[in-house]
Amino acid sequence: MNKRKILVPLGNKSYEVTIEAGILNNISEELLKIGITKNRKILVISNEEISNFYGEKFLNDLKDNKFQVQMFLIKAGESYKNLKTLSEIYDVAFEFGLDRNSIIIALGGGIVGDVSGFAAATWLRGIEYIQIPTTLLSMVDSSVGGKTGVNHPKGKNLIGAFNQPKAVFIDPETLKSLPKREFSAGMAEVIKYGVIRDKELFEYLEIEKNKNELINLKNEYLIKIINSSIKTKSYIVSQDEHENGVRAILNYGHSFGHVIENLCGYGKFLHGEAISIGMNIAGEIAIDKGLWSKEELERQKNLLKSYDLPTEIPKINKEDVLTILMGDKKVRNGKMRFILPKEIGVVDIYDDVEDALFLKFFS
């Protein structure tokens, strides 16, 4: 089946994720289906690279169907996910006359989606927005679940809001324009879903034929893993929208991943690459706590490596690691919470991990 639809069930904030090869070519038709009427103002937020591939055709499709359209391009890179960029979006929104009946469309990767969603949450106290993710990482992770925000010099995503999109449209064809390294980074999040809740997906990713077809970007295989990943995320988000409990398991590998991104400088590692290393650290801690076996850690490590992901821990100062971890949003009552694996497909939340258990992995 070429088209998949997944409901994210959140009461009056529920929405559908539609996965279909080529859906980007007739986006106006999809907007009309979900009740976005003609003549509404649409601010499309993207970046230069994505705009070069899809921008003109995308805007023309909207204009031809009588939508009023403006585009804003975010500079590529984590360093531009900040309040200055947000302020520039507000300026464009004001000049364009974006009102409460208007809509923002995020066309791009995770940075575009995060900033767009937060702009939508805060402009006029909130307007609707749609996610059209164009990277594997944003397809399976950041476009679903409503986490939006920008970075602060003191840490990643410290300024943000939970803001669910009106809809998510995913076109696996856009992955063909990605550098291979970006695709690999997205695979870290897919593998994460396998470790935290979907043993079947993990085993699917281990099969050599599937690996080859995925690396060669075959739509049928891409749709399968995107669909599986989003089903897991949708289920978890529906249980715990605001991350007060079980949703924290989606952060497997992320606490240490954010440390690595922050201390190595945003840009040295892509987000997915940092998460891959973070998953490896969590796996090592799980062995020290007697939670899972060395064989399972090796399976995780080998799978990450097979999709060209790093697992070696960079040299980082121990004191800096503690400082960053204590500033993490996942700290509760002064205690750090870690997501650790018990077996492939099962993880749990722990707040009893002594500093020495993880600091030994850093120089």
UniProtKB/Swiss-Prot annotation:
Its main location: cytoplasm. It catalyses: 7-phospho-2-dehydro-3-deoxy-D-arabino-heptonate = 3-dehydroquinate + phosphate. Zn(2+) binds at E189, H254, H271. Its cofactor is Co(2+); Zn(2+); NAD(+). NAD(+) binds at T134, T135, K147, K156. SUPFAM superfamilies: Dehydroquinate synthase-like. Keywords: Amino-acid biosynthesis, Aromatic amino acid biosynthesis, Cobalt, Cytoplasm, Lyase, Metal-binding, NAD, Nucleotide-binding, Zinc. It comes from the Bacteria. GO terms for molecular function: 3-dehydroquinate synthase activity; metal ion binding; nucleotide binding. Disulfide bonds: none annotated. GO terms for cellular component: cytoplasm. Its EC number is 4.2.3.4. GO terms for biological process: amino acid biosynthetic process; aromatic amino acid family biosynthetic process; chorismate biosynthetic process. Pathway: Metabolic intermediate biosynthesis; chorismate biosynthesis; chorismate from D-erythrose 4-phosphate and phosphoenolpyruvate: step 2/7. Signal peptide: none annotated. Pfam families: DHQ_synthase (PF01761), DHQS_C (PF24621). InterPro entries: Dehydroquinate_synthase (IPR050071), DHQ_synth_AroB (IPR016037), DHQ_synth_fam (IPR030963), DHQS/DOIS_N (IPR030960), DHQS_C (IPR056179). It is found in: Cytoplasm. Binds 1 divalent metal cation per subunit. Can use either Co(2+) or Zn(2+). Belongs to the sugar phosphate cyclases superfamily. Dehydroquinate synthase family. Catalyzes the conversion of 3-deoxy-D-arabino-heptulosonate 7-phosphate (DAHP) to dehydroquinate (DHQ). HAMAP family: DHQ_synthase. This is 3-dehydroquinate synthase. It comes from Prochlorococcus marinus (strain MIT 9312).
